[in-house]
Amino acid sequence: MESADSGRSDPVKGDDPGPSFVSSPPATPSRYESQKRRDWNTFLQYLKNHKPPLALSRCSGAHVIEFLKYLDQFGKTKVHVAACPYFGHQQPPSPCSCPLKQAWGSLDALIGRLRAAYEENGGRPDSNPFAARAVRIYLREVRESQAKARGIPYEKKKRKRPPTVTTVRVDVASSRQSDGDPCNVGAPSVAEAVPP
């Protein structure tokens, strides 16, 4: 009895005269790739809703900073203002009315994803607004101000230098030559190799 698709060959059984590979459905994107796509779509939507609407080709570092400031309204990190009695306290004892903002780490990661997405979507690296100097300066200022406001020092991680190897030269040859055997120069004797 023949099935309805008997005219097709089965690549799994090996009777396919074509290429020897089996095509599989595209792999599901990683969390990073999914987040990058969502971030990219959010940024494009922001440009579309911008007054006046802004084309990606006309986008600059200033527009990226404006976008980051816009995102602050959705933040969940309490950032104390200078006049707040809890300014500089890591664990304030009671609630205050200071604003919630996007955490510096979240903004930094977002910019990294958008920077990559821009180039993956045809943007030139030399015109990438997410890599603009103004954006880097803004992120640095956000990091420093949040560190002061929350009492958390953000210290740059110092690179661990590889340990320096000190070589010590031991002159074994002079003690060997005193034994009178020129062939054993530099080679340990069995008596020296075995502990007493």
Swiss-Prot record:
Disordered: region residues: 1-36, 149-196
Superkingdom to which the source organism belongs: Eukaryota
InterPro entries assigned: ALOG, ALOG_dom
Transmembrane segments: none
GO-annotated biological processes: mRNA transcription; post-embryonic plant morphogenesis
Chief location: nucleus
Keyword annotations from UniProtKB, A to Z: Developmental protein, DNA-binding, Nucleus, Transcription, Transcription regulation
Cellular-component GO terms for this entry: nucleus
MF GO annotations: DNA binding
Localization of this protein: Nucleus
Entries under Pfam families matching the protein: ALOG_dom
Tagged with keyword Nucleus: yes
Coiled-coil stretches: none
Keyword Transmembrane helix belongs to the record: no
Basic and acidic residues: bias regions: 1-16
Family: Belongs to the plant homeotic and developmental regulators ALOG protein family.
Name listed for the protein in its UniProt record: Protein LIGHT-DEPENDENT SHORT HYPOCOTYLS 6
Organism: Arabidopsis thaliana
